[in-house]
């Protein structure tokens, strides 16, 4: 009898253990190695305490690698991830294809900034929740600008930027007037160069989807960029993306850096050697009615292939909530709350007091117009990207040519001719051009 009771007790214990194991859900989250995302991983105890049945596994990758892995996984229905970190390029395309789960429980959805929310919505359904939103702007060293005898306007021209870069450059002391993206990738150098080209009057395609890299506007864009970077940029610039330029700026090696508005809290944070010397301005223009700034939101989405969609939605709702912002504020200060997603943040006096960059961030986001991104008419939407599935592949190939031109291994004219050929071939193959 004793052994029967023992056996029954043992069986019950095993059954309880297996039930507990079944009850525990493991969410695999793919994310980018940017500062705000890395910070989130350290703050998830708030979520796991409230949801003890959910475990989180993080896959943190460099931007280009993340895009490749996530795209491959979702296109092949691999089911490797439960939460994806994707942006305003992927969401409308993947939402339309039925690859993402529509989100139904995002915290205070009407508080999301309209420009950001519309970029993540397909046919009235929200397919991703913004973790942080961004445009791009000029971050500059006020002390070096003073030393150069110049005053940065709130809305500078590219001519002023070139003049300031020339005067701020002091190569003997490893100070470079301008730091810009050079690393090849559709979301790296091509994000910057596409947005910049808009301000030079260029466009990717004419209204019949004909590639435009043989236009004088693209020639002006690339000549200006390569010329300025060779004169005033850091060595090895063709390998530098967002994170590399952030490290250079924080080390005091850049006079100006034109990049994501989200960098503002890092260049003024405790990791920065020049935190108290940084000013902000709108991305430059050429007087043609378009500035060189983009619009983007790193966002969290749930792939249709996830076996844990309900739990994944719970996590997405937590990470993009006002409550999460309050956790960051309590632990790291208001200036470090993920920016660019919620109207309420830009009305919060504590945030506005702590984040000197807030008004310029909001002005930059509001200045971007993804529906009318260019001076001449175009058949596409998107400021620093073209919202068609083929764009990522084409722009990555084009980005390699432009990175090579910056490195000096080919001329600007050769890079533009190759870009034209690559784009022509791909668009004909995809059936856009007959």
Regions found by a protein language model. Give the residues of each.
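Short, well-ordered beta-strand elements
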Residues: 24-34, 54-59, 82-83, 127, ...
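Extracytoplasmic "Venus flytrap"/periplasmic binding protein-like
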Residues: 42-115, 119-121, 127, 147-149, ...
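Conserved C-terminal helix/tail region of periplasmic/extracytoplasmic solute-binding proteins
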Residues: 50, 146, 370-434
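Hinge/lid segment of periplasmic solute-binding proteins
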Residues: 87-136, 159-162, 176-177, 189-192, ...
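C-terminal lobe and pocket-closing loops
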Residues: 92, 262-274, 287-397, 434
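Short, solvent-exposed loop/beta-turn-alpha elements that line the ligand-binding surface or hinge
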Residues: 101-115, 182-185, 200-220, 269-273, ...
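Extracytoplasmic/periplasmic solute-binding protein
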Residues: 127-131, 136, 162-211, 254
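Glycine-centered hinge/linker elements that transmit conformational signals in sensory
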Residues: 164-167, 208-239, 279-284
